[in-house]
Amino acid sequence: MISLEDLDEVSVAQYRQLLGSVRPGHPFLKWDDKGLLLKLGGWKKDRYTGKEGLTVAGLLMFGKTESIVEAFPDYHVDYQEIPESGERWIDRVYPDGTWEANLFQFFHLVWPKVSRSLPKTFKLKNGQRHDEGAVHEALREALANTLIHADYFGIGGVVIKKYTDCFLFSNPGCLLISQAQYY
């Protein structure tokens, strides 16, 4: 089984800090890393064998790059910003060894790049300014869904491309329903 040694402790600490800032006093915050992962579904103990370890979701979300690639040899996440000329990318995020290429880190590196060109809205909610509108929500959902619904056992990786006039989100896998049902 995949163990705590396969976990990127920095990612878990950052997640814990993010959860604490968004939901102070959340009951999951009182647990150690293993307990937190258990509550999130990232750690599992087999009640019949007693074996325990990281789940696939826990590994993908918070794992070390090497451990993820060992479990998923074709794992690759890639963000590219393509200029108007259509030539080679001008900004890119991919597993280059400078960061742990788990889904948590990828999302937090890529989301600011995806959202920075979007127009800012102004709304007050509970006396707090909120700059994100419906387009921000839709793109954040598209990014999250691309990562969550990828078939990491499949061939090919997650690729997010930001063009001057559109975004392309692609991942390995297929629709679980027919195209007729989808449309």
Mark where each language-model region is.
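Active-site helix-to-loop segments that bind/position phosphate- or nucleotide-bearing substrates
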Residues: M1-G156, K161-Y183
